[in-house]
A protein has these predicted regions:
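Bacterial N-terminal signal peptides that target proteins for export
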Residues: 1-11
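N-terminal signal peptide c-region/cleavage motif recognized by signal peptidases
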Residues: 19-22
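Amphipathic beta-strand/beta-sheet edge segments enriched in Tyr/Trp
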Residues: 28-36, 186-233, 312, 333
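Short, well-ordered alpha-helical segments
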Residues: 30-70, 178, 230-234, 270-282
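N-terminal segment of the mature soluble domain
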Residues: 49-66, 122-175, 275-299, 316-317
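Signal peptide-directed extracytoplasmic domains
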Residues: 65-126, 134-140
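A short, hydrophobic beta-strand-centered structural micro-motif
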Residues: 76-87, 157-160, 174-209, 292, ...
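C-terminal soluble interaction/assembly domains
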Residues: 224-227, 255-336
Length: 336
């Protein structure tokens, strides 16, 4: 189902092209929250806590919990849930209903981030008495980071750490957060962001030094505290960076800009359905409108509430689009 595509604004003349071979990281369990009910916590309080976590995954850490629509939903959070079960270890496993959440967040006018997230590739070392060592994906600290990433809706992945990786990335490269080597080594993976992490200390007092590259932005910081808390704070920081760049702003009817999408290589119903599915996830209030079909090229009109930069990022996230020059059309021959 490979096809090339380009997008062109009705006024600005923007064009992009890509091959559909590297999809975005789709969080399959985005609408499921697991948490432990504390001894001093009632079941209703635990359900409200899970609902806040779910709302933050979709609408960011700064979601307005006092907005009337959200506050009312938090009074009876069970109405947003499709299933409540008990997992291993006594944890609550709560499955939320996407449509019910969507209605509440739409009423509150919150910016939203869907299940398609930019993948973040983690290069990490553990500091020990004998020096730094690469963090194995199955090490206890790595499993803690994976759990925290799932809890906060972050699409975290680990490199293979094979000979090709090790020829470019050493423990020192990760500790120094050397962007040239790390970004070069990350090119072989379908990730949008690169994270360098140095983890040290004990479970009771962990220190995490992190650096994130996401698109053209670069952030770094240090987090200290108990291991579980530090991992959660790190994932909240990463989630905030993802949300800032990829969240789709709310817009009233009539505030959407209109864009024209030129798609080449649509060679069947499957490719066309995939394209429409991607466009529907852009946060539009209207269905994409088919303008024309010529051979294997279709032209659709879409409305989008964000900026040109946000639209380009969202399309690139789903279809790995890259900006290109708009093709120059040959002039029509003058009649003789």
């Amino acid at each position: 189902m490979g096809f090339k595509q380009g997008i062109r604004a009705l006024l600005s003349g923007m064009a992009l092209v890509a091959a559909l071979h590297a999809p975005a990281a789709v969080l399959d369990n985005l609408y499921q929250v697991q948490l432990t009910q504390q001894e001093d916590q009632s079941r209703d309080q635990a359900l409200r806590e899970a609902t806040v976590v779910m709302l933050q995954r979709l609408a960011g850490q700064n979601v307005d919990l006092k907005h009337q629509a959200i506050a009312n939903a938090l009074k009876s959070p069970q109405e947003l849930m499709s299933r409540i079960a008990t997992a291993e270890g006594g944890q609550l496993r709560i499955q939320f209903e996407p449509d019910a959440l969507g209605r509440v967040l739409k009423q509150s006018g919150q910016p939203l981030l869907g299940p398609n997230r930019p993948g973040i590739l983690l290069w990490a070392v553990e500091a020990g008495e004998l020096g730094d060592r690469l963090l194995s994906p199955v090490a206890p600290r790595a499993l803690l980071l994976k759990q925290a990433a799932q809890h906060r809706g972050v699409a975290l992945s680990f490199p293979l750490a094979d000979l090709q990786d090790l020829s470019l990335v050493s423990e020192q490269v990760i500790r120094q957060a050397s962007s040239e080597e790390l970004l070069e080594a990350s090119k072989r993976y379908p990730a949008d962001g690169t994270l360098a992490l140095v983890a040290g200390g004990s479970d009771e007092n962990t220190e995490l030094q992190w650096t994130l590259w996401l698109n053209d932005q670069h952030q770094s910081g240090t987090i200290s505290g108990p291991a579980t808390q530090a991992a959660d704070e790190l994932m909240q920081a990463l989630a905030a960076q993802v949300f800032a760049q990829y969240a789709i702003p709310a817009a009233a009817t009539g505030e959407h800009a209109e864009w024209r999408l030129h798609v080449q290589g649509v060679d069947g119903v499957g490719a066309y359905s995939a394209l429409l599915g991607m466009l529907r996830r852009l946060g539009t209030q209207q269905q994409p409108r088919l303008l024309s079909i010529e051979g294997d090229e279709v032209v659709l009109q879409v409305s989008f509430p964000g900026s040109e930069e946000q639209l380009e990022r969202m399309l690139g996230l789903d279809m790995r689009l890259q900006r290109i020059e708009e093709p120059v059309r040959e002039p029509e021959p003058e009649p003789e």
